[in-house]
């Protein structure tokens, strides 16, 4: 019970800060700007698009002719796309990969706050100390 408050705050605070930045910088859906720049736009976005197509159409996951002059998709997946959160692409409509990547970046920032707070609590036994102090 005592874990929920800090964990919820550790998720919500980075989420709110990131959303405030998106509003301030007019990043979609709060404006017409995009969070993707340079490599994220020119490299990751085509990789995510190809992953979406493979997940939705059942295409071969071993090789892709749609990336450059063709590429080994297994190594590309292992290096760039292996996050389990990327599988949320299945739920996203085609044509909105950039918007998905923006939402995914915001979610990952919030989850990093949550998981790091959980790690600190377990590693330094903060949860146990809070329980002993109450007893």
Which residues are covered by each model-predicted region?
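Membrane-interface starts of transmembrane alpha-helices
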Residues: 5-9, 93-104, 126-134
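Start-transfer (signal-anchor) and selected internal transmembrane alpha helices
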Residues: 1-27
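Generic detector of intrinsically disordered, low-complexity, polar/charged segments
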Residues: 2, 28, 65-67, 128-131
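Membrane-embedded helix bundles of polyisoprenyl
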Residues: 14-18, 109-122, 127-135
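Membrane-interface coil-to-helix junctions
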Residues: 17-116
């Amino acid at each position: 019970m005592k874990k929920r408050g800090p964990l919820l705050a550790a998720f919500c605070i980075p989420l709110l800060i990131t959303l405030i930045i998106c509003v301030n910088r007019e990043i979609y859906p709060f404006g017409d700007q995009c969070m993707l720049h340079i490599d994220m736009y020119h490299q990751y976005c085509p990789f995510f698009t190809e992953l979406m197509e493979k997940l939705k159409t059942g295409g071969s996951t071993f090789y892709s002719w749609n990336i450059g002059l063709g590429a080994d998709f297994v190594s590309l997946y292992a290096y760039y796309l292996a996050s389990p959160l990327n599988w949320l692409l299945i739920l996203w409509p085609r044509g909105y990969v950039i918007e998905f990547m923006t939402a995914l970046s915001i979610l990952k920032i919030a989850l990093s706050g949550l998981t790091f707070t959980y790690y600190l609590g377990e590693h330094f036994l903060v949860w146990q100390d809070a329980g002993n102090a109450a007893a």
